[in-house]
Amino acid sequence: MQCPFCNHGELKVIDSRNAPEANAIKRRRECLNCGQRFTTFETVELTLQVLKRDGRYENFQESKLINGLNAASSHTRIGQDQVHAIASNVKSELLGKQNREISTKEIGELVMKYLKKADMIAYIRFACVYRRFKDVGELMEVLLSATPDMEK
C-alpha cells in the first residue's frame, strides 16, 4: 500500500479496530515520509466461480443476478428493495457453502425458492427463462406446482 498523498510505500498502522457495520477492519495509518494520516478499511473478498451451462467458469456477478430478478419482477409488486434483498439472500447462501464453485443450476434454484415466496408471476417468468421449457407440458408442471390449491 502507498500513501495517497505522496505515494510513498512505507506506512505505520496507528490504530486498528473492528468495524462490524461494514464487516471490515478499520485501520488508521500514517505515512513515514510526509506524516499524513488516513483511514483504510480491510474486507474479506470471497470470490465464487460460476460453472456455466457450456462448461466455462466465470466470476459470480451480483449485477447479473439483480438484472435477472428485475426482468422477472417487472410490473409485479416486487420493488427494488425486495430485488436487492433476494439477491443478497441468494449471495449469502452461496457464500455459506463450502464449495466456491457453484453451478448456474444452484443459483437458479435458490432464486426460484425466494421468488416463489415473494411473487408467483415473477416466479413463473423466471422459471420460463431459467428452465428453458421444451413444451407446454413442462410449463404446466411449474404452474401447477406454483398453485397447489388448484385442481389438477
From Swiss-Prot:
Example GO BP? negative regulation of DNA-templated transcription
Family annotation (InterPro entries):
ATP-cone_dom, NrdR-like_N, RNR_NrdR-like
Origin: domain of life: Bacteria
- Gene Ontology MF terms: ATP binding; DNA binding; zinc ion binding
Q: Where are the zinc fingers (unnamed)?
A: 3-34
Q: Does the keyword section mention Transcription?
A: yes
Which prosthetic group or cofactor does it need?
Answer: Zn(2+)
Cofactor: record remark:
Binds 1 zinc ion.
Keywords, ordered alphabetically: ATP-binding, DNA-binding, Metal-binding, Nucleotide-binding, Repressor, Transcription, Transcription regulation, Zinc, Zinc-finger
Annotated ATP-cone domain ranges read: 48-138
Q: In which family does this protein belong, per the annotation?
A: Belongs to the NrdR family.
Q: What job does the chain carry out?
A: Negatively regulates transcription of bacterial ribonucleotide reductase nrd genes and operons by binding to NrdR-boxes.
Name this protein carries in UniProt: Transcriptional repressor NrdR
Source organism: Chlamydia felis (strain Fe/C-56)
Which gene underlies this protein? nrdR
